[in-house]
Regions:
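Long, polar/charge-rich, low-hydrophobicity segments
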Residues: 319-322, 477, 482-504, 510-645
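Replace the tail clause
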Residues: 2-447, 451, 457, 595-634
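Short linear capping/connector segments at secondary-structure termini
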Residues: 268-274, 331-335, 485-495, 549-554, ...
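Glycine-rich, acidic and aromatic/proline-enriched surface loops and short helix-turn segments
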Residues: 252-259, 470-478
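Extracellular/lumen-exposed scaffold segments
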Residues: 379, 591, 608-768
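Extended, hydrophobic alpha-helical segments in both membrane/secreted and soluble proteins
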Residues: 68-75, 266, 287-290, 294, ...
Length: 768
């Protein structure tokens, strides 16, 4: 394979934005905010479509393809450096047919050509995508991501020279790249039995990547990856290491600058390992998924800070991403006035002035300490070194610890913070604001709908469920065609391209989340209708689900991408829909469909569960509810639900540092069953134990007298029928968050033992 230009650069320069009164190109006829940003470029841009393809074929020119999105920082940089530059435009217009694609409107095109970039650059990817295509088949010749002016002109010259002198070699290379893409995105693999170890394998893979000090499952940059925490919470929550990993990660994320401390909502990712300095764009799909994640974490832990994150994020979405029609907008830009994060950054003087203006001068010291501003600046724009250093706001400690520091209850502390944030937000709103991409995307709305519904159900806020229904009804009425097909996008009263599998699957996910929250039958009925339409359009028996409809002439491959990214794979989403429809309807047709879906990605599930954790989470649900449908080897334990009912009194216990209190834990066994005692007398049996998740909480257990019995010819000590265990809790020092206690036991009868169980003691320990 031959190559063209050298390494891509990552330099930046500012050039004046084009005059809005200058002549417009063909992009002015589109509705995409991203394409409309380029309508005044001197480049003769075409939108993706037959007009562009025919022009390239008739003129015998390669196609230059640029793929990006409206809130992409480096897309803006390349526009300023290249596409607004007349010299670059002259080259593009003379030797190429230039095509612009909004990746959010056409995820199918983005998937194909991002794979091409990763193949060409040996794994590197990102936006903008900059590729040259052979015009007859639309196969990629060469390309990369961001190119500055000099290298871009050099690359265009090399492509043009090769096109004239050796087009045969170019076509050969295009075919080779395309074959590799087809092998990666459309390969049909042989079905193999699902191993029951995929959950353990996925869990251990995540825990091996866990950052004990800072939270998260990678080094820098750190992405939120809500599906990681969701997987751990749903499949392995009884594991103490899992609980610590999830809580540390969720705490670190909302305490850092990646969370908008003043306005709520999460930025795209953290540029560092500390979750401190974000890439400042905000995406609907991140916030929709993270609302569900934090709501679920609140449900499992009772931690009030997670509820606060949910409330603040939904307030942000209501305020800044809600469309008057009923749906949700897509995203907000990373930059303001060509400066990344300008709207969100603060200097000490600005904070003082904002609070003084709100008659809150007495809160200045508190605020500077709260958000780390009194420790000096922490942000220097890497692209504009001439700008003075400033501050990304972050929490200097966990809110529970800070509340204790100020001798406040958590609600009192949060009310104090809310008042400060309101004053800062009032001033911030007077600044120039990042651009909002105001198109409505069905798939992303599905995730946000689920976020509202999940939060409303868990936190018992019916208004959130109603907001989810409002968005769902808008899509079902305005973005659904008479033939039953969905539209992918909507903007200013106009629909865009038809939807893809991810749109159907995600919207069904949202509808079923509403149904789980309020049992609205219409939501369930609409979900069933959409599922049948999706099955008609995207499913092929014996092959699985495809991302696109068949017969698309502008695609040289019909993709079926299985791995999760920032958004779960469409196949993973549809599997979850099948499992939920099975649960809600009892119709075994959905079970059969789910098993076929699992078969289609069985090799991925067994070999790389970390890449398909969303699917693995749903497989785990089916393994538990329908173990007979999976061909795993029987293990040495009896397959049976728990025989033990655990209760605790009091249900809620309040503790302060240095205090002690006692809870009573009661285990009631089914008739004929017992649990092994705390000392079993047999090395092959699992003893009953209780463990504090927080080292600051010390347990003193008053073990009752056990019974002796003979099992397998050997003595073993057990607790039978009912056992009551007093446990004294000693809080050594102030800790952050509420605390939990884990119980572990093994149930046995005269013939067999069950697998060991780990469950949370149903007592809530509230740290005052």
């Amino acid at each position: 394979m031959f190559s063209f230009a050298g390494e891509q650069d990552s330099i930046s320069s500012d050039q004046p934005t084009e005059d809005p009164d200058s002549p417009r190109n063909r992009l002015s006829e589109t509705t995409s905010p991203y394409l409309l940003q380029h309508q005044h470029n001197p480049v003769h841009w075409y939108p993706w479509g037959e007009e562009a393809f025919e022009a390239a074929r008739e003129q015998n020119k390669p196609i230059f393809l640029s793929i990006g999105y409206s809130t992409c920082y480096w897309c803006h940089v390349m526009e300023r450096e290249c596409f607004e530059d007349q010299e670059v435009a002259d080259w593009m217009n003379k030797f190429f047919i230039s095509v612009k694609v909004d990746r959010e409107e056409r995820p199918d095109i983005d998937e194909i050509y991002m794979t091409a970039v990763q193949l060409i650059t040996r794994g590197r990817g990102g936006w903008p995508i900059s590729l040259f295509l052979e015009p007859e088949t639309l196969k990629p010749i060469w390309g990369g991501t961001y190119f500055p002016k000099g290298r871009f002109i050099s690359l265009m010259k090399q492509i043009q020279d090769k096109w004239v002198s050796d087009v045969k070699a170019i076509l050969t290379q295009a075919n080779q790249i395309a074959d590799a893409i087809v092998g990666r995105l459309s390969l049909i693999q042989e079905t193999i039995p699902i191993s029951p170890e995929i959950i353990e394998k996925g869990t251990s893979s995540l825990l091996s990547r866990f950052d004990d000090n800072l939270g998260g499952f990678s080094g820098s940059p750190k992405f939120p990856m809500p599906m990681y925490n969701d997987f751990l919470m749903e499949t392995s929550w009884d594991n103490l290491q899992v609980q610590k990993a999830v809580k540390k990660t969720l705490d670190s994320m909302f305490m850092g600058g990646m969370y908008d401390q003043v306005g709520g909502g999460f930025h795209r990712y953290s540029t560092d390992a500390k979750w401190l300095v974000p890439h400042f764009e905000k995406m609907l799909y991140d916030n929709g998924q993270l609302v569900s994640t934090y709501a679920r974490a609140y449900e499992l832990t009772g931690e009030p800070t997670y509820a606060t994150v949910v409330e603040e994020t939904l307030e942000y979405v209501n305020r800044e991403l809600s469309a008057s029609e009923g749906g949700f907008y897509s995203a907000q830009d990373a930059e303001t006035n060509h400066l990344e994060g300008e709207t969100y950054l603060w200097r000490e003087l600005q904070i003082r002035e904002a609070l003084e203006e709100a008659d809150m001068a007495n809160e200045v010291s508190f605020t500077l300490s709260l958000y780390g501003v009194d420790g000096g600046t922490n942000f220097q724009d890497p692209h504009h070194k001439e700008e003075a250093p400033t501050n990304v706001l972050f929490l200097t400690n966990h809110p529970n610890v800070l509340a204790s520091k100020y001798k406040l209850s958590y609600p009192e502390f949060q009310a104090k913070v809310d008042a400060v944030d309101k004053a800062l937000l009032t001033v911030r709103d007077t600044r120039d604001q990042p651009t909002t991409d105001d198109k409505i995307i069905t798939a992303w709305n599905g995730m946000m709908i689920a976020g509202y519904a999940d939060a409303g159900r868990i936190m018992q806020n019916n208004s959130w469920v109603e907001r989810a229904m409002e968005a769902a009804n808008f899509i079902l009425s305005d973005m659904k065609l008479e033939n039953g097909k969905l539209l992918r996008t909507w903007r200013e009263g106009k629909g865009g391209a038809e939807a893809f599998l991810i749109d159907y699957a995600s919207l069904i996910h949202g509808l079923l989340a509403i149904y789980r929250a309020n049992e609205n039958k219409k939501m369930l009925e609409d979900a069933i209708v959409l599922y049948e339409k999706a099955r008609e359009l995207f499913y092929v028996s014996g092959e699985g689900w495809y991302d696109t409809e068949k017969g698309k002439s502008d695609l040289f491959v019909r993709t079926r991408a299985l791995s999760d990214g920032a958004i779960p794979a469409a196949t993973s989403f549809i599997l979850g829909d099948q499992v939920n429809l099975l649960e809600f309807t009892g119709d075994n047709t959905y079970l059969e469909d789910a098993l076929e879906t699992i078969n289609s990605e069985s090799q991925w599930l067994n070999a790389q569960p970390l890449a398909v954790l969303v699917a693995a989470k749903h497989v785990d649900r089916l393994m538990k509810s329908h173990p007979d449908k999976f061909g795993s080897e029987p293990n040495s334990f009896v397959e049976k639900d728990s025989t033990v009912n655990m209760s605790c009194e009091p249900k809620t216990l309040e503790l302060s540092a240095g205090e002690s209190a006692t809870i009573i834990v009661t285990l009631e066994m089914e008739r004929g069953w017992h649990v092994n005692a705390n000392v079993t007398g047999n090395e092959y049996t699992i003893p009953l134990s209780f463990t504090s998740i927080d080292d600051n909480l010390v347990l003193e257990i008053d073990w009752p007298k056990s019974e002796q019995m003979i099992s397998g010819g050997e003595k073993v000590y057990v607790f039978g029928s009912t056992v009551t265990i007093p446990i004294t809790l000693n809080l050594k020092q102030q800790s952050k968050g509420n605390m939990s206690i884990m119980a572990r036991w093994q149930s046995c009868n005269e013939k067999a033992c069950l697998a060991p169980e780990e469950k949370m003691v149903p007592c809530r320990v509230v740290v005052e």
